[in-house]
């Protein structure tokens, strides 16, 4: 438990302190956000705000994980390392995208093909990796089975199809958080709650772990490294919480694709290694809602030849154009996220109670 608390504290302090320095450095270099012309007109005032703040989150999380293990003299686990690879790998792709926007002074970053290839490489290596590296009990970080609260036995896929499923989950999750990151503090605050939920969930799995002699066979959880996954989850939650100090309206820095792609990938990674892939739809409901709003808007527009369901997508922009203040939209969306996270954890716990 010590390394869990230590990781959360170090990552939070890291972003609280590090982000301030990073803002000054970016401002001195003149590296700021470019605003798309087709966005809400109220966002024009945000032009020039420093971006790539996700870099501070990534560095703080990696540092926190390292410090937690060095201080407690414990070994890192393959499950945690794979999630951190997914987190930092997608973050690096996002960093290249942000850097291209800044250096070329345009609102569009990497070419779609290059960005997709980079994301695919990171996702594929993670998806393959989680299917290997069994522990002494034969449990691998991930599983070919689609999971809800545990692996679903009748949805056990061939390994190759399981890999495809994980890749699709990563693609959907990373882009969902990216779409949500459109208002000051929205994605950061929501991510804090989601990773906080995965911290609680992983700690519970560790306490009811099949590899513990006292819980084996008693409706336990067949996962590989739940304690270390909790270390990663709280490190990310802590980093997001600290970053929110600078990212809340009026934002002094944005996550950028560096942060949103990294956080989205890590959410998917958490779901895979904790065997809660379909539960992610509930815990991350806000991200799902935002994504569905875009899909619905585009589909209806194409089918009807120009009609729209919303004033603008993603959904948070729709409410902005209806006259809601940005802070109002963010807080109400946070409330939705909090309710969804609570519902997800409630379902997770209720299933365990029902099995006793």
Swiss-Prot record:
Matching Pfam families: Glycos_transf_4
Names of the cofactor(s): Mg(2+)
EC id: 2.7.8.13
Species of origin: Cutibacterium acnes (strain DSM 16379 / KPA171202)
Name of the protein this chain belongs to: Phospho-N-acetylmuramoyl-pentapeptide-transferase
Sequence similarity: Belongs to the glycosyltransferase 4 family. MraY subfamily.
Membrane topology: Multi-pass membrane protein
Catalysed conversion reaction: UDP-N-acetyl-alpha-D-muramoyl-L-alanyl-gamma-D-glutamyl-meso-2,6-diaminopimeloyl-D-alanyl-D-alanine + di-trans,octa-cis-undecaprenyl phosphate = di-trans,octa-cis-undecaprenyl diphospho-N-acetyl-alpha-D-muramoyl-L-alanyl-D-glutamyl-meso-2,6-diaminopimeloyl-D-alanyl-D-alanine + UMP
NCBIfam families: mraY
InterPro entries: Glycosyl_transferase_4, PNAcMuramoyl-5peptid_Trfase, PNAcMuramoyl-5peptid_Trfase_CS
GO CC terms, sorted: plasma membrane
Keyword Cell membrane among UniProt keywords: yes
Compartment list: Cell membrane
Gene: mraY
Pathway, per record: Cell wall biogenesis; peptidoglycan biosynthesis
Function according to Swiss-Prot or TrEMBL: Catalyzes the initial step of the lipid cycle reactions in the biosynthesis of the cell wall peptidoglycan: transfers peptidoglycan precursor phospho-MurNAc-pentapeptide from UDP-MurNAc-pentapeptide onto the lipid carrier undecaprenyl phosphate, yielding undecaprenyl-pyrophosphoryl-MurNAc-pentapeptide, known as lipid I.
CDD domains: GT_MraY
Membrane-spanning residues: 4-24, 53-73, 76-96, 116-136, 152-172, 186-206, 228-248, 253-273, 278-298, 333-353
Keywords, ordered alphabetically: Cell cycle, Cell division, Cell membrane, Cell shape, Cell wall biogenesis/degradation, Magnesium, Membrane, Metal-binding, Peptidoglycan synthesis, Transferase, Transmembrane, Transmembrane helix
Chief location bin: membrane
GO process annotations (BP): cell division; cell wall organization; peptidoglycan biosynthetic process; regulation of cell shape
UniProt GO molecular function: metal ion binding; phospho-N-acetylmuramoyl-pentapeptide-transferase activity; UDP-N-acetylmuramoyl-L-alanyl-D-glutamyl-meso-2,6-diaminopimelyl-D-alanyl-D-alanine:undecaprenyl-phosphate transferase activity
PANTHER family membership: PHOSPHO-N-ACETYLMURAMOYL-PENTAPEPTIDE-TRANSFERASE, PHOSPHO-N-ACETYLMURAMOYL-PENTAPEPTIDE-TRANSFERASE HOMOLOG
